[in-house]
Amino acid sequence: MAPARAGCCPLLLLLLGLWVAQIPVSAKPKDMTSSQWFKTQHVQPSPEACYLAMSNISKYIEWCKDLNTFLHEPFSSVATTCQTPNIACKNGHKNCHQSSGPMSLTMCELTSGKYPNCRYKEKHLNAPYIVARDPPQQGDPGYPLVPVHLDKVV
């Protein structure tokens, strides 16, 4: 009797689950390595206004990203962070590293709009950050380890 009471709901839930699974968790462009995409999304040595900086990201993913943080230092400095002692990431993996001190950052938070007209408020701060790292892939700079994910602003 239980299956009869369930009706179409299990099928609907299955179809909904399959549809949601098609949405990419990481909208990394196919022609970029994880490190190159990290650099595009998060490394900005010279601060830019959020609306301008985020439009560069939106053109790849074709939607308005809810929140993004830019690190105002060269990629080489962020890559050096990958040489600090390992710490646990938010997901429990042990491939994260914290910056040696506070760094200049800009956080861009979506306030309204639909792609391509995304509107953001920006918050400037100095804070340490935590990045996840991996070995470089073909096409990445020649560092022993490269940042691939901004895990947290501390």
Curated annotation (Swiss-Prot):
> What is the official name of this protein in its record?
Ribonuclease 8
Question: Which positions are annotated as binding substrate?
Answer: K65, D66, L67, N68, T69, K90
Provide the taxonomic classification. Eukaryota, Metazoa, Chordata, Craniata, Vertebrata
What gene name is given for the protein in this entry? RNASE8
**Which CDD domains does the entry link to?**
RNase_A_canonical
Where, subcellularly, is it found? Secreted
Q: Name one Pfam family in it.
A: RnaseA
GO terms, molecular function: endonuclease activity; nucleic acid binding; RNA nuclease activity
Which PROSITE patterns does this UniProt record tie to the protein?
RNASE_PANCREATIC
According to the record, the signal peptide region is 1-27
Superkingdom classification of source: Eukaryota
**Can you list the disulfide-bonded cysteine pairs?**
C64-C118, C89-C96
Q: What EC number(s) does its UniProt record assign?
A: 3.1.27.-
Keywords for this entry? Disulfide bond, Endonuclease, Hydrolase, Nuclease, Secreted, Signal
GO biological process terms held by the UniProt record: defense response to fungus; defense response to Gram-negative bacterium; defense response to Gram-positive bacterium; innate immune response
UniProt GO cellular component terms: extracellular space
Q: What class of enzyme is it?
A: hydrolase
Question: What family does the database annotate?
Answer: Belongs to the pancreatic ribonuclease family.
Name the species this protein comes from: Chlorocebus aethiops
Q: Which residues act catalytically here? A: H42 (proton acceptor), H149 (proton donor)
Sum up the protein's function in the record's words: Has a low ribonuclease activity.
